[in-house]
Amino acid sequence: MHLKIDPEVRRALQGKRPVVALESTIITHGMPYPENLATARSLESQVRAGGAVPATIAVIGGVICVGLSDKELEWLAGAKNVLKLSRNDLPYAIATQKIGATTVAATMIAANLAGIRIFATGGIGGVHRGAETTFDISADLEEFARTSVAVVCAGAKAILDLPKTLEYLETRGVPVIAYGTDEFPAFWSRQSGLKAPLRLDTPAEIARFLEVKWSLNLTGGAVICNPVPAEDEIPFHEMRTFIDSAVDEAERYGIKGKAVTPYILARIVELTGGRSLRTNMALAQNNARLAAELATHLQ
């Protein structure tokens, strides 16, 4: 099945112990080296501290690897020409034996194949600005509607059109749950000015929600929005200036498709003097902690 499950992950799944999936584009496309490696290791540590087993996912040598060794993490963090994989090109990477990092969509697919129901990431993809003319909409949103894996995130990446992203998720019947807040978080910022569709206040409540959803045969995932810790956030009004500048540059330089998000994120790191990178690392760790709690309650 082109799937290789790490022995520790396999034992945990067979023993009905909690497992949390982790994506790999945050390593290869989301952060520079060596911060990417430090973050990858930290995310796995946070999951372990929460009583779950981490399963970082990537495509290596034509195989979907569910769970990476520390040596593999280190190698991936420094690898060049790594493909950024979604549903459409996951088979291509396997068939041609390429190296590929999994986006939210591809990680959900791999997690589902392995029997993992909880996945922690930084922020999800969504509807890009200007999508009414470009039709640039992340495949992540369709994956939420079809694959039964719950994703813990800090909301959608704030570089996106957040109102349209929420509308799209509603249209596709995807539950969007804000953890302990009435507001839809905006990645680097706790607030976006948008009301969250649903609110739940404990991991146990979220786990119960997921159990009910899936018991009703309502296939598809759920977006669990976990606001960045207050001490680590950059307020939305402040981030908006940096985002607008980076988005305008990307348009001016003709950057399109899968290159857009990595370019804008890297440019925002420069514009914020590294603050956005530190916030990104903090929110990812915060999401890993919540995902571990949630996975424990789902057992």
Curated annotation (Swiss-Prot):
EC nos: 4.2.1.70
Keyword Metal-binding: yes
InterPro entries per the UniProt record, alphabetical: Indigdn_synthA-like (IPR022830), PsuG (IPR007342)
Amino-acid positions noted as binding Mn(2+) in the UniProt annotation, renumbered to this chain: 136
Stretches of the chain forming a coiled coil according to its record: none
Hydrolase in keyword set: yes
Keywords on record: Glycosidase, Hydrolase, Lyase, Manganese, Metal-binding
GO MF annotations in UniProt: hydrolase activity, acting on glycosyl bonds; metal ion binding; pseudouridylate synthase activity
Details of cofactor binding: Binds 1 Mn(2+) ion per subunit.
Top-level division of the source organism's lineage: Bacteria
Enzyme class: lyase
Cofactor: Mn(2+)
Functional summary from the UniProt entry: Catalyzes the reversible cleavage of pseudouridine 5'-phosphate (PsiMP) to ribose 5-phosphate and uracil. Functions biologically in the cleavage direction, as part of a pseudouridine degradation pathway.
HAMAP family (alphabetical): PsiMP_glycosidase
Subunit structure: Homotrimer.
Family listed: Belongs to the pseudouridine-5'-phosphate glycosidase family.
Full protein name: Pseudouridine-5'-phosphate glycosidase
Gene: psuG
